[in-house]
Each structure stands twice: as C-alpha cells, then as structure tokens.
Amino acid sequence: MRVVFMGTPDFSVPVLEALVAAGHEIAAVYCQPPRPAGRGKKDRPTPVHARALDLGLEVRHPVSLKGAEAQADFAALGADVAVVVAYGLILPQAVLDAPRHGCLNIHASLLPRWRGAAPIHRAIMAGDEATGICIMQMEAGLDTGPVLLRSRTPIRAEETTGALHDRLSAMGADLIVEALARLPELTPEPQPEDGVTYAAKIDKAEARVDWTRPAVAIDRQIRGLSPFPGAWTEIAGERVKLLASRLDEGQGTPGEVLDDALTIACGTGAISLIRLQRAGKAAQDADIFLRGWPVPKGTRL
C-alpha cells in the first residue's frame, strides 16, 4: 500500500520501521518540527524525523494542517491510507478524507477507556489490570472512531509507564501491519457509549508524593509517572525522583523510613523504593543510591 506515516516521538518509531519492513511504500513522513533541546538549545529533530532520514524517506513537518496549501500538498501524495500514531496535530476533515482508506490511528488503550493524551500513564495510575492497542478509523472527535482491531495485554505488577510504553509500541507495530494486510475484510466496530474515560495530559503538580495516601495509590503513582515526569519526594530537603517501587509490609508514621533498605511507611501499608534519581545525577538502584547517600531508619520524607 501507499502509506503516509504521521508520528513524532519514540513510541512511533517501531511502527514506521514495521511498515517499511512489511514492504509498504511510504509516500511521506509527517512529524512535529525540530525543537530546541539540550544544553545548547539547538534545534533537534524528533525521533521519527531522525529515523525517517536514516531510512531515506521524505520528511514533512508543517506547523499546522489547517491551511488549504498544506491540505493540498497532503492530498497530492495520493495515499491509500495514512497511519497516525502520536503525531501531535489535529487532523482537519480534509486530511482525514484524503487517503483512499482514510486515516488509521494506533491508540495505546482499550477504547473507549482512556481516550486522550496519556493513556499509558493513566492506566497504571488507576490500577488497571490490563490495557492494549486499538487500530481506530479516525474521525473528527477525540479518539471516538470505530475500531478495526484491538489487542489486549496484562499490566504487570511492578511495570512502569516506560516499560509498558515499549511493549505497547511493539504491539502497535505488529497490529497495524496485520490491519493493513486484512483491511478489505475488517469491519469497523463503533465504540460503546458506556465505559468512556479520558486520559488527561499529565500535570507536573501530580508528581509530588503525599505519604499519607495508601501504599497502593503511591506505588501506582510512582510507576505511572516513571520515567517522566517522575514522582518525587524530599530527602533531607533535596528533591529526589522515585522511578520504581513495589508494595511491601510495614507500619509507621507516613513518610517514615522503616529500615536500611528504603521501605517507607504510607497512610496504610508501605512501599519499597527500588530506583531513585537525585537532581543532575543518573538514576540508580536503591542499593547503589544508599552507598552514596545513606538514609537512616527513622528519617522522615
């Protein structure tokens, strides 16, 4: 098939690679424009942009698709289908209608649960037991289109957003290749009206840990916000990111360090901190962290 690919971050890269490996003709790659990054604040291409150039593909990065010229340029590609995954721009109706088979979106949830910007984070933070990938026929609404294919996967007990992100990206790549191969036989299924939830964009204000909350909720918060933006607490007045944790046993005053291995009392129950990161430093497993900065039993976070 002649495919227009539309995606921007790391999550999208395996999908582009899978489409190329499957023999599809990539008419063009659309992604967000390069943006300043790093200490020098030099413009840096997005992950999809960089990989597309490696693959010898044409890259386009318009700041908007609302204008008639941008829409005409898109339509002129004569695509059979557009594959959209974490692109970052709203697609006007003229763009949605241009490819012969429309635009297919790869969404990282079991729709209609977790429509919106942060479905992976929200699934973990809510304590969902499973999530998945949906291949959706795009329409004007936010993740409201009918679903062509879906694949379900359990969320593992200590899984972080980062780890689940990588698993779902690989699943999405496999599922879109299957969807394109079976496109003539697939019947889009409208999403049910019941069970709709919205995955709001993560606000950094959600990242500070309140140790008076139950251990289960704090563990979900830490795993759901890892690696970005990273849940955090203060140790001896210094902000420290908490990147991995597990539920543990123990009781004490909320925020109290219960042993020499960073088991922390919560409002109910306790958690063990597994991986931490000081400001300006690399992330470390708890045992290595404690060698450089012992946190005595009885310390209050």
Swiss-Prot record:
PROSITE patterns: GART. Its EC number is 2.1.2.9. It comes from the Bacteria. The keyword Transferase applies. InterPro entries: Fmt, Formyl_trans_C, Formyl_transf_N, Formyl_transf_N_sf, Formyl_transferase-like_C_sf, GART_AS, Met-tRNA-FMT_C, Met-tRNA-FMT_N. Keywords: Protein biosynthesis, Transferase. The keyword Protein biosynthesis applies. GO terms for molecular function: methionyl-tRNA formyltransferase activity. PANTHER family: METHIONYL-TRNA FORMYLTRANSFERASE (PTHR11138), METHIONYL-TRNA FORMYLTRANSFERASE, MITOCHONDRIAL (PTHR11138:SF5). Belongs to the Fmt family. This is Methionyl-tRNA formyltransferase. The lineage of its organism: Bacteria, Pseudomonadati, Pseudomonadota, Alphaproteobacteria, Rhodobacterales. The gene is fmt.
